[in-house]
Amino acid sequence: MNSFLQLKNISKHFNTRKKIKVLKNLSYNFDKGKMYALMGPSGSGKSTLLNLMSLIDRPSIGSIQFDKNIVNFDNNKKNDLFRAKNIGIVYQENNLLSDFTALENVYLANLSIDNDKEAASTKAKTLLKKIGLSNRLNHFPSQLSGGECQRVSIARAIINDPEIILADEPTGSLDLNTAKEIFQLLNNQKNPNRLIIFATHNRFFADKADCLLEMTNGSVKTINV
């Protein structure tokens, strides 16, 4: 099995009046071809861990490796490019650009690594049509339902064919039927060369993952594989 993402002795603390340790000496290997669910109460460190794995934030202690290459968190330019090419991110809340259409939100993600606007637009159109939004291409986020916004978010996350998809409560703000549709769309993105990790409070969706991880007190343990 190819352990593509390795976390080694990760700790993360935030300095306020009192040092708050969110993650504590956490180590775990994630394999390509699998979907992992992160469960745990609010404040257990799920979002913090996803931010570290997406290179949005850096650990206080420890290292992160992608395909055995250690991340240098001082090289922001390299990390930004790696994220754009290799990591797709889906958030719980609508994170779309409000002044851009659904189509523009998706193809702009492709333009971050390819300056061919026409090719990016064509690719985005094909992708949005494939996920059932052919009649919403020129709609702005405010004109879309919550489920439609999440479909656009997933399209934006996968347009560059990333090796990793990270999703933070992607169904959390949706009604159950819409949540099931969005989860199925996310699940459909699995392939042998891709790793998917999502955080959730919903055991129904967590149980559908290949591996369920429980986060408590800044650490993680495997519930099932």
Give residue spans per PLM region.
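The feature captures the beta-strand-to-loop junction immediately N-terminal to the Walker
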Residues: 39-41
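Conserved ABC transporter NBD signature motif
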Residues: 62-73
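Short coil-to-helix segment of the ABC ATPase nucleotide-binding domain corresponding to the Q-loop/switch region
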Residues: 100-109
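Catalytic Walker B motif of ABC-type/P-loop ATPase nucleotide-binding domains
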Residues: 165-168
